[in-house]
Amino acid sequence: MCSENFKKFLVSEASGGIFLIAAAVIAMVFQNGFLSEFYNSFLHIDMGFKFGEFLLQKPLILWVNDGLMAIFFFVLGLELKREILEGELRNPAQVVLPAVGAIGGIVVPAFIFYLFNHTDSFAARGWAIPTATDTAFALGIIMILGARVPASLKIFLVTLAIIDDVCAILIMAIFYSGDLSLISFGVAAIVILGLLALNLLNVNKKSFYLILGIILWISVLKSGVHATLAGVISAFFIPLKCKNSDKSLLKEIEHDLHGYITYFVLPVFAFVNAGISLKGIGLEQLTHPVSLGVILGLFLGKQIGVFGFCFVAIKLGFAKLPKYSCWISFYGLCILTGIGFTMSLFINSLSYNDTDKFAYADKLSVLIASVISGVLGYIVLYIASVRKEKIEVKAQNESF
């Protein structure tokens, strides 16, 4: 049975997928219509602030990718901590299958991408693009099917997505960091100690965490490590429970920010990153090794990796198929993990530093693979549910 909190999470994530789709479509219309010049100028408006000798100035698109997405990763960190302490990740037995699937869903897509691009060192930087899963879109498709999809499969997908996001965070920290600044690292370390002190003293004032979180974000941004990691680090120091009080600061902040993430941050990210120009894109661009690596990595690599690794784990007795599901419905869910969209676009921006070297075919490939995975995953899950209904009806008739 799903808890009320889990049901609310599913509904918000699924409805948020509609906003994501709308934002992406609007961006495509802007980029390929008469508003393309305005759209591109808007994305590159310089914004920033100065404090004494300190100056922080970036184009709007980088404020979104480095700033707003840090808030997204902050909420992701809160969800992860809550799940580890009292949620789905608390029970090791429930984590085995999603963890195995997440590993397969990273290894196989990355291998497929590398096969196509190992001869070009710059192109090969995008190996992590097809390893991500967009939870909002995948859950959106599942919610359309409603009760046809067992709750156990929804829990499996969410748990896999959480583990997948943790791996994405580690990948960004290890492989997509720039030139490192020891001074900025030192400042970040001091701030982290401050956050640790707040946690140990069980301070429940949001403003204290906010101030230190902003300082941490700036120091991490200047350190050469991607600034979004500051969000995850800050989240881990937010107390789940407060002494002498029934309220949870972590849950309170998560509740306050979740709507902004779902209906503002992610749609804005989609709007500024999904505006792909279709001018000059033809068969040559779509058959480029990067495009093939992304499309085949997301569409084939994710489903083969997740399903294949889970199949082996189940057959060896390390895990069990989710309750009330069959191999067909489980396979349909594995196909949905090929919906990369937001996270894949985000890793794409880190891989190629927002250049248009591949004429946006790399971004278009993410959209193509995500759409194919979404449509086919829906069809397979629907077929599995119809087949299950027929078997149940036949069993009822035979009982009479």
UniProtKB/Swiss-Prot annotation:
Keyword terms: Antiport, Cell inner membrane, Cell membrane, Ion transport, Membrane, Sodium, Sodium transport, Transmembrane, Transmembrane helix, Transport
GO biological process assignments: regulation of pH
Membrane topology: Multi-pass membrane protein
Subcellular location: Cell inner membrane
One MF annotation (Gene Ontology) recorded for this entry: sodium:proton antiporter activity
Substrates-to-products reaction catalysed: Na(+)(in) + 2 H(+)(out) = Na(+)(out) + 2 H(+)(in)
Alphabetical list of InterPro entries matching this protein: Na/H_antiporter_dom_sf, NhaA
Coarse class of the protein's main subcellular location: membrane
Transmembrane segments: 9-29, 60-80, 96-116, 127-147, 155-175, 180-200, 210-230, 263-283, 294-314, 327-347, 366-386
GO cellular component: plasma membrane
Family: Belongs to the NhaA Na(+)/H(+) (TC 2.A.33) antiporter family.
Role of this protein: Na(+)/H(+) antiporter that extrudes sodium in exchange for external protons.
Name of the featured protein: Na(+)/H(+) antiporter NhaA
Natural source organism: Campylobacter curvus (strain 525.92)
